[in-house]
Amino acid sequence: MMNKIVLDENEIPKKWYNINPDLPSPLPEPKNPEGGKNIENLPRVFSRGVLEQEMSMERWIKIPREVMDVYKMIGRPTPLFRAKGLEEMLDTPARIYYKREDYSPTGSHKLNTAIAQAYYARKDGAERLTTETGAGQWGTALSLACSLMDLQCKVYMVRVSFNQKPFRKTIMQLYGGEVVPSPSNHTEFGRRMLKEDPEHPGSLGIAISEAMEEALQEENVYYSLGSVLNHVLLHQTVIGLETKKQLEIAGETPDIMIGCVGGGSNFGGAIFPFVKDKLDGKLDCEFIAAEPKSCPTLTAGEYRYDFGDTAGMTPLLKMYTLGHDFVPPSVHAGGLRYHGMSPQVALLVREGVINARAVPQHTIFESGVKFAKAEGVVPAPETCHAISVAIDEARKCRETGEEKTIVISFSGHGLLDLKGYGDYLEGKI
């Protein structure tokens, strides 16, 4: 029995996997709103490299050498662990594995795309990147990536998370990022939101609008997105491609794969290489997207065209949405407080390839504490959603006696999210 499966540096995937040509039905194209030029504005805020990847129908896209060098520097490939302690705690015949994206220097999967986006922006002559962040994982990753690529970085951090997680601001600043709470006085849209509500908690949709507004108005400034779009999920497929090799080494075939979803990047990156096998009839695996009960995009949203941001600056995307003006409750899983979803993930849910479940905040912290006690690793509140669903599935196996193989995308650690755990332990959640 292998408790940890580690790959060599030379086993980092050489290419990213693009699921677009393998989707079960064509992906609906982005649209302009009536009278708008949102699509035409994209080359003003995104680098050529990521825009080409966004619409590409090539199945495999080579990872540039400079990006590969940084992947090695930050510790890829990441290990796959067997959760023996959790299995014993639950007394389940299921075998549980978790892919350790928390091994990254910034503590989550986000660097996989931050490095690539910063590389392509620098190649285009950008001097600065603007972005949004919820819990701070994405802002932290882009701050480091910009530092490594000799770029400036400005992060609009959702106000409720800015207040909940002060050390996230510190680490972003340590890497050279400028951090402002969103909504802010730095943009016209932010000022409008604050005028309506001076205590506005913010949302990812608002922060995206602010970051895009700044990028549109200034020269040599690009916008960088942490989730949702195809190029982001494409970069994250290094997770799933590595996991595939590691499960083969362990002699395992996954029966259930689980990840948390906000915009869908860690989940999509983890499962897309396996989704292709399922669509090709080579794999019988259930894919479960775990989302917050307070922001139930997949389980309660509508499948329709909507903006990716609150101000309506992005093109209209066909996805599950709660409405671009939806402001989620101020939960601790700030990285999942998003109204929309990756169009690819949304289409696969619509087609019945992916299932979705919504989990309440109290339950996710209960699951996180169990995992920490069993495995010694403190999961991020976002990651706890996936762990909670995995625990439910492992308990079902205990009842049925089935020896299923369950794989969790462990998207990040929670060492900078301890206020949420503290509130849970003190009975405030």
Swiss-Prot record:
A cellular component term, taken from the record's GO annotations: cytoplasm
Residues modified as N6-(pyridoxal phosphate)lysine: K110
Catalytic activity: (1S,2R)-1-C-(indol-3-yl)glycerol 3-phosphate + L-serine = D-glyceraldehyde 3-phosphate + L-tryptophan + H2O
EC number(s) per entry: 4.2.1.20
One Pfam family per UniProt: PALP
Names of the cofactor(s): pyridoxal 5'-phosphate
Pathway participation: Amino-acid biosynthesis; L-tryptophan biosynthesis; L-tryptophan from chorismate: step 5/5
Gene3D superfamilies: 3.40.50.1100
Superkingdom per UniProt: Archaea
Enzyme class: lyase
GO molecular function, one term: L-serine hydro-lyase (adding indole, L-tryptophan-forming) activity
Record key words, sorted: Amino-acid biosynthesis, Aromatic amino acid biosynthesis, Lyase, Pyridoxal phosphate, Tryptophan biosynthesis
CDD domains on file: Trp-synth_B (cd06446)
InterPro entries noted in UniProt: Trp_synth_b-like, Trp_synth_b_CS, Trp_synth_beta, Trp_synth_beta/beta-like, TrpB-like_PALP, TrpB-like_PALP_sf
Stretches the record annotates as Disordered: 18-40
Similarity annotation: Belongs to the TrpB family.
Function per UniProt: The beta subunit is responsible for the synthesis of L-tryptophan from indole and L-serine.
Subunit comment: Tetramer of two alpha and two beta chains.
Protein name: Tryptophan synthase beta chain 2
Lineage, opening ranks: Archaea, Methanobacteriati, Methanobacteriota, Methanomada group, Methanobacteria
